[in-house]
Design a protein with these regions (language model features):
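Surface-exposed extracellular loop regions of Gram-negative outer-membrane beta-barrel proteins
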Residues: 429-431, 461-506, 527-556, 676-690
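N-terminal periplasmic "start-of-domain" segments of outer-membrane beta-barrel proteins
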Residues: 21-46, 69-80, 84
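Short acidic/polar hinge/loop motifs at secondary-structure boundaries
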Residues: 51, 57, 84-112
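Face-selective signature of the C-terminal outer-membrane beta-barrel domain
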Residues: 214-222, 226-238, 266-433, 458, ...
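Single conserved hydrophobic/aromatic residue that forms the stacking wall/gate
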Residues: 2-13
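N-terminal periplasmic accessory domains that precede
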Residues: 9-10, 19, 23, 51-54, ...
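Outer membrane beta-barrel strand-and-loop segments of large Gram-negative receptors
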Residues: 343-347, 388-395, 495-497, 501, ...
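Outer-membrane beta-barrel translocator/receptor signature
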Residues: 120-127, 135-185, 209-213
Length: 747
C-alpha cells in the first residue's frame, strides 16, 4: 500500500520541543493494488458537506452539475456500505448520497479492479462507503444538528462496548423544502407532410418537500478468540409530496398559428425505502490467524410507491377539442404505482495463506431476488374526477432471479510485487410472469465465466505502478425491464423492455502513484469496450394515425417514444489524475480531474456519436489563526455525449469555515455556502434522431448556505468488530431509478 494526500488542518503528531510544536498531517488517500481509499473522516469539509459533495474530491469519481455520479467515467457502478452491497443506493445514488451527511462516514473505497470474489457486475467499479467507528473501544455519543436554506436536519451516533459485546447505532433525519424548479423543451419535426404540426414547445415548473431518514444498528459478539458473530440492521429512505404545472403548444411551420395547446396540473406523493439485515459468522484458524471461513446471510427489501393525479386544462382550439382529446388521449388520470425488490443471499467464503508469499481465497453464493411491479391506472372522462380502472393501461408482473456463483482467487506478494488473478462462474435463471397488462411469461437461463487479473509493483519507496484487466457484466434492473407504458406526458412516452439481456464490458487499466512530503500524485489510464450495451433509444412517432403498442397502448403522431435495448457498442478511453500539494503544515491544495474520449455506436439504429469530455475539481484548505479552518473549492465540466446527443457543462464553487471548541475538540461549529451568486442554474440537453431534433433545459435551485453543530461526549476507544468477509451483491444495473412507472425516466 502507498499513502498519498495529506490534510492540512488535522494534527496527528505533536511533539513539543523547547516550546516549538512540530506538526505532521494525516494521509487522506491510500492506494492498493486494486483500489483507492479516500479518508472522509480526516477531511474538515466532512463536518458540513453531504457524501455527494465529498465524492467530488475522491479520485476516479466525478459528480456533474446535475449531481449525477460516475466512477471511472461510467454511470454503471455499484455502491456498498461497510462491505455489503446496497441496491437502493446503486439505483438512486443522486437522491440518497446528497441526503446523507458526510460526518457519518469514515472513508470511501473506489474498487477499480474488482477481483473474483466480487459479483461480476459493475462496469465502472465499486464504491464502498465505510461508516465511522472502526478501531476504537469504550463508549461515545455524538449529537448533530444543521439548518440551511432548504431545510433542517439532526442526527446521532452512539456506541457502547461491554465485555465481548459491542453495539453501535446511527440515526439521521433531514427535512427538505426546496425552491421551485423550472424546465422547458423544444422539438422540431422533420416530417414533410405535417407542416401544421412542426414545432412542439413545452414549459413546466415543479416543487417538492419531504423527509429523508437513515439509520443502522450493528452488534458483534466475540464468542472466543477464534469465533466472531456479527449482526446488523439498517434502513433509509424518503417520502415526499410534489406538485407541478405545465403548458404545451404545437406550432405550424410558420410559427404563427398553433395546431393545439393545453395546460397540465399534477400533484402526488411518493416514497422509497431500503430495509436490510445480515448476520455473519467468522471462524479463524487457531494455527494461522489469516486462515478463516465465513458464513453469511442477508435479506433486503426495497419498497417504493408513487400516487399521482394529472389533470388537463384549457385545451384549445375549442372547435377541435374532442378530436385533440381523442388523438392525444388527454384524459384526466390517477396513477398508483408500487414496486418492490426482495432479496435473500446465502454465502460462504474461505481464505488461507500458503507459506509467506501466497494466499488462496474461494467461495460460493446463492441469491434469490424477486422484483415485483404493480402499476394501476385510472381514467376520468372529460373534465370529471370519476376515475375508472383501465386494465389495458395498467401493468403488474413478477421477475424472479436465481443466481448461483463460485469463485477462486490467488494472491502472490513478493517484496514490492503483487499479483492477483481470479476466475468467477455465474449462472442466472430468470422467470418473468405477467399478471396484468401486455407481455407473455418467459424463462431464460444463461451463464458467464468472468476472469480478472491485477498486479502492482513498488518502484522504490515512494512510487507504485498498478495494472489490471476485468470483465464485468450488467443485468438490467427493474426500471429497464418494466413494460409499463408511461404516457403521463402524451408527447414524451417511455416504456421498459422485458426482453433485455445482460451487457458485458471489458476494461484495462494502468495507474501510477508517487508521493513525497510535499507533492502527491495519482494517474490512472483506462480503456473499456462493450458490444451489447443497454442504451435508451428515442424515436419519433411518424404515422399520422399514431402507433399502437402491445396491450392497446397508443402513441399519437409526433410523440417521442423512448425505451431500452441491447443496441450499444462503446469504446471509451479516459485519464484520471489526482494531485495534492502540501504547501505548508497548515495549507493543502488539491486537484481531482478526468479527461475522457467516447465513441458510441448502434449499427442497428444507424446511430453514431463521439467526442471528448473533461472535468476538474480542486480546492484549498487552510488553517487560519485561532484554529479556524477555511475550505475553498470549485470545479466544472465540459458537456458529456450520449448515443443520441449531449448534455450540458457545469461549474461549481463552495466556501466553508469551521472551528472546534472545548477539551478534545468535543464541540464543532461549521458554516458553509455554495454557488451564492446565482439562485438558479440552467442545464441543457440535446437529442437527435433521423427525423427530429429535441432540446431541453432545466433550471434548478443553485444557491445553498447553512450551518451545522455537533457535540461529542464519552470516551471512544474501540468499535464494532466486524467479520472480515461478508456479502457483496453487485449484480443489478443501476442508475435507472427515481420513478415508479418503470420504463424510463420521462422528459
Amino acid at each position: 500500500e502507498i499513502l498519498i494526500g495529506l490534510v492540512g488542518s488535522e494534527m496527528c503528531i505533536r511533539d513539543r520541543l523547547k516550546g516549538v510544536e512540530v506538526v505532521a498531517q494525516k494521509p487522506l488517500v491510500k492506494v492498493d493494488v486494486d483500489k483507492i481509499e479516500y479518508n472522509i473522516e480526516d477531511d474538515p469539509d466532512s463536518k458540513s458537506n453531504s457524501i455527494l459533495e465529498m465524492l467530488r474530491k475522491v479520485p476516479l469519481v466525478t459528480v456533474d452539475g446535475e449531481d449525477n455520479v460516475q466512477v471511472n467515467g461510467s454511470s454503471s457502478f455499484k455502491i456498498h456500505v461497510n462491505g455489503k452491497p446496497n441496491n437502493m443506493m446503486s439505483n438512486n445514488p443522486k437522491e440518497v448520497l446528497k441526503s446523507m451527511p458526510a460526518n457519518t462516514i469514515k472513508y470511501i473505497e473506489v474498487i477499480t479492479s474488482p477481483g473474483a470474489k466480487y459479483d461480476a457486475e459493475g462496469i465502472g467499479g465499486i464504491l464502498n462507503i465505510v461508516t465511522v467507528g472502526s478501531g476504537f473501544e469504550g463508549y461515545t455519543a455524538t449529537f448533530r444538528g444543521n439548518a440551511n436554506n432548504n431545510g433542517v436536519g439532526a442526527g446521532t451516533y452512539a456506541m457502547v462496548k461491554q465485555g465481548k459485546l459491542t453495539v453501535s447505532a446511527n440515526y439521521n433525519y433531514n427535512y427538505n423544502n426546496s425552491p421551485r424548479s423550472y424546465s422547458d423543451s423544444y422539438r422540431e419535426n422533420y416530417e414533410p407532410d405535417k407542416e401544421n404540426e412542426k414545432y412542439l414547445e413545452s414549459e413546466s415548473s415543479s416543487k417538492s418537500k419531504g423527509n429523508f431518514q437513515y439509520g443502522n444498528l450493528e452488534a458483534s459478539y466475540e464468542i472466543d478468540t477464534l469465533r466472531l458473530l456479527t449482526v446488523a440492521f439498517g434502513m433509509y429512505g424518503s417520502s415526499d409530496k410534489s406538485n407541478s404545472d405545465g403548458n404545451t403548444i404545437m406550432h405550424g411551420a410558420d410559427r404563427q398559428d398553433f395546431a393545439y395547446r393545453y395546460r397540465t396540473d399534477n400533484h402526488g406523493k411518493g416514497s422509497w425505502y431500503s430495509i436490510n439485515g445480515n448476520i455473519d459468522y467468522q471462524r479463524t484458524s487457531r494455527k494461522n490467524k489469516e486462515r478463516m471461513i465465513t458464513f453469511s446471510y442477508k435479506i433486503n427489501s426495497q419498497p417504493q410507491t408513487n400516487d399521482s393525479y394529472n389533470t388537463y386544462l384549457d385545451i384549445e382550439p375549442d372547435e377541435n377539442k374532442l378530436d385533440i382529446i381523442k388523438e392525444l388521449s388527454l384524459k384526466n388520470f390517477h396513477s398508483d404505482g408500487k414496486t418492490n425488490t426482495m432479496e435473500q443471499t446465502f454465502q460462504v467464503d474461505y481464505t488461507t495463506p500458503i507459506g509467506k508469499l501466497h494466499t488462496i481465497e474461494t467461495g460460493a453464493k446463492y441469491i434469490f431476488r424477486r422484483n415485483s411491479s404493480d402499476n394501476r391506472f385510472y381514467e376520468a372522462e372529460g373534465a370529471s374526477e370519476n376515475y375508472a380502472y383501465n386494465e389495458n393501461r395498467s401493468s403488474e408482473y413478477r421477475h424472479l432471479n436465481h443466481i448461483l456463483s463460485a469463485y477462486a482467487g490467488y494472491t502472490l506478494k513478493y517484496k514490492g510485487f503483487t499479483f492477483k488473478p481470479g476466475l468467477r462462474y455465474e449462472q442466472t435463471i430468470q422467470e418473468v410472469k405477467y399478471l396484468v397488462g401486455p407481455g407473455e411469461n418467459f424463462d431464460s437461463n444463461f451463464s458467464d465465466l468472468v476472469p480478472s487479473v491485477s498486479l502492482g509493483i513498488k518502484l522504490g519507496k515512494t512510487q507504485n505502478l498498478r495494472g489490471g484487466y476485468n470483465m464485468r457484466i450488467w443485468r438490467p434492473g427493474i426500471w429497464n425491464l418494466n413494460p409499463y407504458f408511461d404516457n403521463q406526458n402524451p408527447m414524451f412516452i417511455s416504456q421498459g423492455n422485458p426482453n433485455l439481456k445482460s451487457e458485458k464490458s471489458h476494461s484495462f487499466d494502468l495507474s501510477y502513484s508517487s508521493f513525497t512530503s510535499k507533492f502527491n500524485i495519482n494517474l490512472s489510464l483506462r480503456h473499456s469496450f462493450n458490444n451489447n450495451g443497454i442504451e435508451r433509444i428515442s424515436r419519433l412517432i411518424t404515422d399520422k394515425d399514431g402507433e399502437i403498442f402491445e396491450g392497446g397502448h397508443k402513441a399519437p403522431y409526433g410523440a417521442l417514444y423512448s425505451t431500452y435495448g441491447n443496441i450499444g457498442k462503446s469504446r471509451e478511453t479516459g485519464l484520471n489524475f489526482y494531485l495534492n500539494w502540501n504547501a505548508s503544515p497548515k495549507t493543502r491544495i488539491y486537484v481531482n480531474g478526468r479527461g475522457n474520449y467516447s465513441d458510441l455506436r448502434s449499427p442497428a439504429q444507424e446511430l453514431h456519436n463521439y467526442g471528448w469530455n473533461a472535468s476538474a475539481y480542486g480546492g484549498i484548505q487552510q488553517t487560519l489563526p485561532g484554529k479556524v479552518r477555511l475550505s475553498l473549492n470549485g470545479g466544472g465540466s465540459t458537456p458529456r455525449i450520449s448515443l443520441q446527443g449531449k448534455g450540458s457543462g457545469y461549474s461549481y464553487y463552495s466556501l466553508g469555515l469551521s472551528r472546534s471548541f472545548l477539551k478534545e475538540e468535543r464541540l464543532s461549529l461549521n458554516i458553509y455556502c455554495s454557488n451564492v451568486l446565482e439562485k438558479y442554474r440552467t442545464y441543457n440537453n440535446h437529442t437527435e434522431g433521423a427525423n427530429f431534433i429535441s432540446k431541453s433545459s432545466s433550471k434548478y435551485p443553485s444557491r445553498y448556505y447553512g450551518f451545522s453543530i455537533s457535540y461529542r461526549l464519552g470516551e471512544l476507544k474501540a468499535s464494532v468488530k466486524k467479520a472480515a468477509r461478508s456479502i457483496d451483491n453487485d449484480d443489478v444495473k443501476g442508475g435507472g431509478g427515481g420513478g415508479n412507472t418503470g420504463g424510463g425516466g420521462g422528459q
